[in-house]
Curated annotation (Swiss-Prot):
Entry keywords, A to Z: Chloroplast, Plastid, Transit peptide
Function comment: Involved in modulation of redox homeostasis to regulate leaf senescence mediated by age and stress factors during plant development. Its function is dependent of EIN2, a central factor of ethylene signaling.
Subcellular location, record wording: Plastid, Chloroplast
Family, per entry: Belongs to the ATA15/OSA15 family.
PANTHER family with a match to the protein in the record: SENESCENCE-ASSOCIATED PROTEIN AAF, CHLOROLPLASTIC
Protein name: Senescence-associated protein AAF, chloroplastic
KW Metal-binding (keyword) present: no
Length: 417
């Protein structure tokens, strides 16, 4: 009979069996020297009887490794180191030295360390395989996500193209519907016009439009007559004032000097030649009023004469003058706007132009015609430079009293303001 020794690893599906005679002998020796066997005084015969039982004896070590002893027949009886005699004979068991027990312990510890090392190596292999599986799974998930994003992008592109096609199709449909409505409206309007013409209402509309045009022409003629009347009244007042001054023998005049040089900012006297020219212009305008429905402002010479007269009479801020300047500055005729720009550019100062004249110049400076805009801009810059005062300049307002009868001796009293 012999002992078969096997190791049982906890939580391990594999039971490793070893049939080794020397190992069986060591286990048996350890059992013989067990303290319990020594205290009870067990004999070799009792040990034999104990070994012949079919129960399992378990020894648990401190390293969680169990050793199971099974009783059974030995496959190789020649390798047994124990000899069991027959019944009635004494059983002889040799004593082992202490060196054998220490060697047994060393071998046991070495085998246990090898087992632990092998187990750790297997655990590392399993861990490495698990990490590799996780890495492969992560790569697979990333690939799945990438393919999902690509599918979403392709789906978005398809949806965008579909929406674009739908919008274009709807726009074409709306354009087609609008064209149909336009054709229907044109046909209905044509039918209504034909019906209106057949009923005689269109002729009434034409008469009404002609009446409104004549009414507008009469209003323009009335405005022109009032304008001419105002200018005529101003000329008469100017001539009366000149006659009064000639009777008294003195004329007072305000002048402005800059650095000792007189500036012609203020209007002076109107000469007899200018008055006669204005009277001829009035007569021509009056004859034109009898033939036409208003003053012909498209004549550049006539317009320049009117504006120059208003400047000389210091009447640029009047109601009729302001309406004339506004109408001529926004006229569609290029020659009219150009003549107005030239006439306003001939003004001696901003003082004589007034708000109406400067407003007309600013509108002409923004004209679409480059020549008109350049002329108006130059006039504005020239007028602004007259009032620029640099360091060291001096401006003086002078009141000059003159006697027109004295040609040789001119006595003037200058009062500085």
């Amino acid at each position: 009979m012999a002992l078969n020794v096997s190791k049982v690893v906890p939580n391990s599906p594999i039971l490793v069996k070893s049939v080794n005679a020397s190992r069986s002998r060591r286990v048996l020796l350890a059992y013989v020297h067990h303290p319990l066997a020594a205290n009870k005084g067990s004999s070799i015969e009792e040990l034999k009887q104990g070994l012949c039982c079919t129960k399992t004896v378990t020894f648990v070590s401190s390293r969680r490794c169990s050793t199971l002893c099974f009783v059974g027949k030995s496959q190789d009886t020649e390798t047994n180191s124990q000899v069991v005699q027959k019944e009635g004979e004494k059983q002889v068991m040799p004593r082992r030295k202490s060196s054998n027990s220490s060697q047994l312990l060393v071998e046991y510890v070495s085998n246990d360390a090898k087992f632990v090392n092998e187990r750790a190596r297997n655990d590392f292999v399993l861990l490495s395989r698990g990490i590799m599986r996780l890495d492969a799974r992560a790569r697979q998930d990333v690939a799945i996500l990438g393919s999902g994003f690509l599918k979403l992008d392709a789906r978005a592109r398809e949806d965008t193209e579909k929406i674009d096609r739908d919008v274009k199709r709807k726009a074409e449909r709306l354009h087609h519907i609008a064209t149909i409505f336009k054709n229907i409206a044109e046909s209905k309007l044509k039918n209504a016009a034909d019906k209106h013409w057949s009923d005689g209402a269109l002729e009434a509309d034409l008469r009404r439009a002609d009446f409104r045009a004549k009414q507008r022409a009469m209003e323009d003629a009335l405005m022109a007559l009032e304008f001419i009347k105002n200018i005529h009244d101003m000329m008469v007042n100017k001539m009366v004032d000149s006659l009064v001054t000639s009777e008294t023998g003195t004329t007072d005049r305000i002048s402005l000097e800059k650095n000792g040089i007189a500036l012609g900012f203020f209007p002076g006297e109107v000469s007899s030649d200018r008055i006669s020219a204005i009277e001829e212009a009035y007569k021509s305008m009056a004859s034109a009023l009898s033939e036409a429905d208003g003053i012909d402002y498209t004549d550049p010479e006539e317009l320049e004469l009117l504006v120059t007269t208003l400047i000389d009479l210091d009447a640029m801020d009047g109601k009729s003058s302001a309406s004339l300047l506004a109408e001529c500055s926004s006229s569609p005729d290029v020659n009219t706007r150009k003549a107005l720009a030239n006439a306003l550019a001939a003004a001696p100062s901003m003082w004589t132009l007034g708000n109406a004249g400067m407003g007309a110049l600013q509108r002409l400076a923004e004209d679409s015609n480059p020549a008109i805009a350049a002329a108006a801009s130059r006039a504005i810059n020239a007028l602004k430079k007259q009032w620029e005062v640099e360091e060291g300049d001096s401006l003086r307002f002078m009141m000059n009293f003159e006697r027109p009868n004295d040609d040789d001796d001119v006595d003037s009293d200058l009062d500085e303001i």
